[in-house]
Swiss-Prot record:
Organism, scientific name: Photorhabdus laumondii subsp. laumondii (strain DSM 15139 / CIP 105565 / TT01)
GO molecular function, one term: GTP binding
Gene it is expressed from: upp
Record: residues binding uracil: I193, G198, D199, A200
Pathway per the UniProt entry: Pyrimidine metabolism; UMP biosynthesis via salvage pathway; UMP from uracil: step 1/1
Annotated function: Catalyzes the conversion of uracil and 5-phospho-alpha-D-ribose 1-diphosphate (PRPP) to UMP and diphosphate.
Matches recorded under PANTHER family: ADENINE PHOSPHORIBOSYLTRANSFERASE, URACIL PHOSPHORIBOSYLTRANSFERASE, CHLOROPLASTIC
Means of activity regulation: Allosterically activated by GTP.
Protein name: Uracil phosphoribosyltransferase
Amino acid sequence: MKIVEVNHPLVKHKLGLMRAHDISTKRFRELAAEIGSLLTYEATADLETEKVTIDGWCGPVVVEQIKGKKITVVPILRAGLGMMDGVLENVPSARISVVGVYRNEETLEPVPYFQKLASNIDERMALLVDPMLATGGSMIATIDLLKKAGCQSIKVLVLVAAPEGIAALEKAHPDVELYTASIDERLNEQGYIVPGLGDAGDKIFGTK
């Protein structure tokens, strides 16, 4: 599995701000979108372009455009919505697919409860966004769902990732690509990433 920890100074600075215990909902939300935008920049660096001729201000001009690559942005409810606007800044024509996953309290297994996928998803590259890759359960379940629908090109964008989640994702789906602002130390006993960001969903939506 291709794993990219984005070591750009802007990414590291913004993520450092997000780790503050007393950060406001407004600021956390802004930074989640900003890092989402920067991760998208990295994740789309290998898109193929083609030369086309357009009418410029002084006549015909040859320019480069992305070659026929259809994209869908896939936020995992609910926290993934906090990164979506930042991703769309770079790929504004992308279709949006939404997936909801909950954890069964008895089996502790992730269970998809909602999905609304873009049309022709089998022809699209999916940018799957969620702030955290902790155990990897929700991410793996979502990728299972996307592949079942025919989507075979999937890139995962997360703010922070735990080694345990990375290992689980690589075992289940070695063909996906992972882009993260940080590979953190570990999971604690409650399944939170350390040092992590706390509960990203609560911080984005201002809930507890």
